[in-house]
Amino acid sequence: MAPRGFSCLLLLTSEIDLPVKRRA
């Protein structure tokens, strides 16, 4: 598994997940 791809995906999911949790 590529570290760059994983960190990029993790960053994207965390950025999308945080606002959703705050709104919920």
Swiss-Prot record:
GO terms for molecular function: G protein-coupled receptor binding; identical protein binding; receptor antagonist activity; signaling receptor binding. The lineage of its organism: Eukaryota, Metazoa, Chordata, Craniata, Vertebrata. Keywords: Apoptosis, Cell projection, Cilium, Cytoplasm, Flagellum, Mitochondrion, Nucleus, Secreted. Changing P19R: Abolishes secretion. Largely unstructured in aqueous solution. Expressed in testis, seminal plasma and sperm (at protein level). Higher seminal plasma levels are associated with normospermia than with oligospermia, asthenospermia or oligoasthenospermia (at protein level). Higher sperm levels are associated with normospermia than with asthenospermia (at protein level). Expressed in retinal epithelial cells (at protein level). Expressed in the heart, skeletal muscle, kidney and liver. Lesser but significant expression is observed in the brain and the gastrointestinal tract. This is Humanin. InterPro entries: Humanin. Changing P3A: Abolishes neuroprotective activity. Plays a role as a neuroprotective factor. Protects against neuronal cell death induced by multiple different familial Alzheimer disease genes and amyloid-beta proteins in Alzheimer disease. Mediates its neuroprotective effect by interacting with a receptor complex composed of IL6ST/GP130, IL27RA/WSX1 and CNTFR. Also acts as a ligand for G-protein coupled receptors FPR2/FPRL1 and FPR3/FPRL2. Inhibits amyloid-beta protein 40 fibril formation. Also inhibits amyloid-beta protein 42 fibril formation. Changing L10D: Abolishes secretion. Changing C8A: Abolishes neuroprotective activity. Formation of short irregularly shaped fibers with BAX with fibers showing non-uniform diameters. Formation of thin irregularly kinked fibers with BID.
